[in-house]
Amino acid sequence: MYIIPAVDMKEGKCVQLIQGDPTKRHVEYDNPDEIAKMWIENGAEMLHLVDLDGAIDGERVNLPCVKKIIQESKVPVQMGGGIRTIQDVEELVDLGINKVIIGTVAVQNPDFVEQLAKKVGSDKIMVALDAKDGKVVIKGWKEKTEYTPVQMGKILEEKGAGSILFTNVDSEGLLNGINITPTKELVDNLNIPIIASGGVTTIEDLIEFKKIGVAGVVVGSALYKNNFKLQDAINTVNNFKI
């Protein structure tokens, strides 16, 4: 199981938001590429980049940071944030992004996933599923759909999604710990890899995710607030036998 540090970028800086709110930030650093390098030096085997400006305003102001991170890092990079068109996806794949994360547009139009999979290959397509109160939410968590994560996950898998990034919004960015059940339901019902995200506060949380069989866990706030050291987490999780 990969432990994947999040590098969230806003206006060229590395930030961590609380509950996705651009006005509420846990932390802020000037050089996202330096942060990415630090995580790799501390053992990260994969990075999770989020372009918050792309996600919030449709602007790609963080592209220079992204290019720098890709050039300097020798680990796979997955990236999301405001990716809405085939052109967006192709540009990022050409740039060297290993997995491009799409969200709302995939849930609203699963056929789009099929088009993308044909164009760049399923392995490059990761769909972000966000859930609140047991239902998938879209548009920056503002709009609730009628689908459960498993229902939507099955549709997306059928359409060619290569993996799912699942965020339980109820716990995201609050440092309250995790509710493992919705993630376990996805792992149990889908055949593609599930990457978990949201609410990790302790190494024990990571162990819980390993027990249910997720492929990786994205960790943000807990690392930036120094709840635990990345290297310690990697060692503990790798040594834990199920």
From Swiss-Prot:
Pathway listed: Amino-acid biosynthesis; L-histidine biosynthesis; L-histidine from 5-phospho-alpha-D-ribose 1-diphosphate: step 4/9
Origin: domain of life: Archaea
PANTHER family named among the record's database cross-references: 1-(5-PHOSPHORIBOSYL)-5-[(5-PHOSPHORIBOSYLAMINO)METHYLIDENEAMINO] IMIDAZOLE-4-CARBOXAMIDE ISOMERASE (PTHR43090:SF7)
Name of a matching Pfam family: His_biosynth
Active site positions, chain numbering: D8 (proton acceptor), D130 (proton donor)
GO biological process, one term: L-tryptophan biosynthetic process
Entry's family note: Belongs to the HisA/HisF family.
UniProt catalytic activity: 1-(5-phospho-beta-D-ribosyl)-5-[(5-phospho-beta-D-ribosylamino)methylideneamino]imidazole-4-carboxamide = 5-[(5-phospho-1-deoxy-D-ribulos-1-ylimino)methylamino]-1-(5-phospho-beta-D-ribosyl)imidazole-4-carboxamide
Keyword list, A-Z: Amino-acid biosynthesis, Cytoplasm, Histidine biosynthesis, Isomerase
NCBIfam families named among the record's database cross-references: 1-(5-phosphoribosyl)-5-[(5-phosphoribosylamino)methylideneamino]imidazole-4-carboxamide isomerase (TIGR00007), PRK13585.1 (NF010112)
Primary enzyme class: isomerase
The protein's name: 1-(5-phosphoribosyl)-5-[(5-phosphoribosylamino)methylideneamino] imidazole-4-carboxamide isomerase
InterPro entries: Aldolase_TIM (IPR013785), His_biosynth (IPR006062), HisA_bact_arch (IPR006063), Isoase_HisA-like (IPR044524), Isoase_HisA-like_bact (IPR023016), RibuloseP-bd_barrel (IPR011060)
EC number: 5.3.1.16
Gene Ontology cellular-component annotations: cytoplasm
Species of origin: Methanococcus voltae
GO MF annotations, alphabetized: 1-(5-phosphoribosyl)-5-[(5-phosphoribosylamino)methylideneamino]imidazole-4-carboxamide isomerase activity
Taxonomy of the source species: Archaea, Methanobacteriati, Methanobacteriota, Methanomada group, Methanococci
Localization of this protein: Cytoplasm
